[in-house]
Amino acid sequence: MAASGGSGGKATELLRCLPRVTLANLRPNPGARHREKRRGRGIHGGRKSGRGHKGETQRGNQPRLGFEGGQTPFYLVIPKYGYNEGHSFRRQYQPLSLNRLQYLIDLGRIDPTQPIDLTQLVNARGVTIQPLKRDYGVQLVEEGADLFAAKVNIEVQWASQLAIAAIEKNGGLITTGFYDPRSLDVLCKPVPFFMRGQPIPKRMLPPEDLVKYYTDAENRGYLADPRNVLEARKQLARKYGYVLPDITKDELYQMLSTRKDPRQIFFGLAPGWIVNMPEKKILKPTDERLLSYYSS
């Protein structure tokens, strides 16, 4: 078939005649590479060879980077301050506002009649948790506290005082709990973990610097005494001026009073159990040593 006339036909004919592009015929574009100017050597210096007149710059090497002629350099005069000290070890908590939580409940992504933890929040696409990037869970912030109207039993990792008051004013309960990176990964991605057929690990206790936070009833810590938590709920209600609802008379009292064991990761699943996804069965250990290990 003959090539069509015009510039298109000429280009097609040119491509047909040119050799294929290979490593043997690749070349830089003209003018892309500039040959470095070769300075003079010995008596063939070619006048000053770009080094100027007599002195240190012509005869010797250039001073090192940062040299200021003998005086104390800038990087030694200004003292160091650890603004970013330990930045790679700091724990991060992804923010979740009360406004966002109410939005997820209104859309039906989160069921308020069931206990809420990171599994429900991640599945509802409310937050994104990346344990490999030093994420340690969710912090509940008070944005939208005046508009929040749901009654929930929620577990987060960090919460402000006003956010706690907004939850409890509606008759809900909130708990702050710590998860180590492995437990956090299992909690955020339960289905891939169950498909591997491994026993549910036990949750590790918080490090030393977080023990005070999670044992404090004012923070609703999961290691705090329940009697102190009840007293802290009453004090917070007096502080913000609302009447604390009596959840013992609520029809959802059983759901609202559900709490995890300090070693437990999932609601209703104990450490050491194996979830068989293909057969939809739960395998529980019977050996005394395993029971002693997972309960300790």
UniProtKB/Swiss-Prot annotation:
Protein name (Swiss-Prot/TrEMBL): Large ribosomal subunit protein uL15m
Compartments where found: Mitochondrion
Sequence ranges of Basic residues compositional bias: 32-52
Gene Ontology BP terms: translation
Entry annotated with the keyword Transmembrane helix: no
Single annotated GO MF: structural constituent of ribosome
Subunit structure: Component of the mitochondrial ribosome large subunit (39S) which comprises a 16S rRNA and about 50 distinct proteins.
Keyword match Phosphoprotein: no
GO cellular component, one term: mitochondrial large ribosomal subunit
Transit peptide start and end: 1-20
InterPro entries assigned: Ribosomal_uL15 (IPR030878), Ribosomal_uL15/eL18 (IPR021131), Ribosomal_uL15/eL18_sf (IPR036227), Ribosomal_uL15_bac-type (IPR005749)
Ranges where the record places region Disordered: 25-66
Record key words, sorted: Mitochondrion, Ribonucleoprotein, Ribosomal protein, Transit peptide
One Pfam family in the UniProt entry: Ribosomal_L27A
Native organism taxonomy: Eukaryota, Metazoa, Chordata, Craniata, Vertebrata
SUPFAM superfamilies: Ribosomal proteins L15p and L18e
Source organism, top-level taxon: Eukaryota
UniProt record similarity statement: Belongs to the universal ribosomal protein uL15 family.
